[in-house]
Amino acid sequence: MKAVVLAVAALFLAGGEARHFWQRDEPQASPWDKIKEFTTQYVDSVKDSGSEYLKQFETSALGTQMNLKLTENLDTLSSTFSKLREQLGPVTQEFWQNLEKDTEWLRQEMNKDLADMKQKVQPYMEQFQKTWQEEVERYRQKVEPLSTELREGARQKLQELQEKLAPLGADLRDSARVHVDALRTQLAPYSEQMRERLAERLAALRDSPSLAEYQAKAHEHLKTLHEKAQPALSDLGQGVLPVLESLKATLVGAIEEASKKLSSQ
């Protein structure tokens, strides 16, 4: 199971490199940076929207009577969560950095395979693009006189024009289907070859002597992450507990006061 997880992680990293290779984009942020950025944005969004509703409730008649201090409690929880995120950040980032380092050879091999595949496939893609442009130009030349006829003709000729365009559109679709099928047939051997190479790379990764060593490292990282998370989670629980107790006591007091008023009537 650990080997499967490691292989998926390696494919994730190698896949990111392959995407940059084909798109020629600048490398993006690390997975941990993306997770951290998303979490920060989500928590800030929830905090901002939640604070607005809590302030409205606190200023209401019921909120003033109950004196819940929800905004203050929300700030306390936000501070505790930020502390937890800061404690877990270095450990998780170190795990991703080690994973990228240990799978560097796999990414290099995959990039070589992709470069070789791109070189072989490029002529077919260029020919497909050239043929398709010729088909579109041929279609445009046939349609242009009909468009002129439409502009110069009356409305009663619209139906006739549509009838003339229908077979041309069908012809273009049929031509496109033929070219796509031909391209698919030409690329099929390369797709199969790429799948075989990927299987070989994964087999080499699975049989690598360093796999057991890396599994031990991953286990140690997870153990360290768990140990460092425990105090922060404990602090989070301690921060939430007073809020719940305060809310419970306030609600109980409000219920008792309401019961006394009903009894005295």
UniProtKB/Swiss-Prot annotation:
Keywords from the UniProt entry: Cholesterol metabolism, Glycoprotein, HDL, Lipid metabolism, Lipid transport, Lipoprotein, Oxidation, Palmitate, Phosphoprotein, Repeat, Secreted, Signal, Steroid metabolism, Sterol metabolism, Transport
Q: Which GO terms describe its cellular component?
A: chylomicron; extracellular vesicle; high-density lipoprotein particle; low-density lipoprotein particle; very-low-density lipoprotein particle
User: Which Pfam families would you find in this protein's record?
Assistant: Apolipoprotein
sequence repeat positions: 68-89, 90-111, 112-122, 123-144, 145-166, 167-188, 189-208, 209-230, 231-241, 242-265
Report the subcellular localization. Answer: Secreted
Q: What is the disulfide pattern of this chain?
A: none
Q: Does the keyword Signal apply?
A: yes
Q: Where is this region: 10 X approximate tandem repeats?
A: 68-265
- How this protein is processed and modified after translation, per its record? Glycosylated. Palmitoylated.
Q: Give the molecular function GO annotations.
A: cholesterol transfer activity; phosphatidylcholine-sterol O-acyltransferase activator activity; phospholipid binding; protein homodimerization activity
Position of the signal peptide: 1-18
Identify residues that carry Methionine sulfoxide: 110, 194
Q: What does this protein do?
A: Participates in the reverse transport of cholesterol from tissues to the liver for excretion by promoting cholesterol efflux from tissues and by acting as a cofactor for the lecithin cholesterol acyltransferase (LCAT). As part of the SPAP complex, activates spermatozoa motility.
What's the subunit arrangement here?
A: Homodimer. Interacts with APOA1BP and CLU. Component of a sperm activating protein complex (SPAP), consisting of APOA1, an immunoglobulin heavy chain, an immunoglobulin light chain and albumin. Interacts with NDRG1. Interacts with SCGB3A2. Interacts with NAXE and YJEFN3.
Query: What family does this chain come from, according to its entry?
Result: Belongs to the apolipoprotein A1/A4/E family.
Q: In its UniProt entry, what is this protein called?
A: Apolipoprotein A-I
Give the species. Answer: Dipodomys ordii
What gene name is listed for this protein? Apoa1
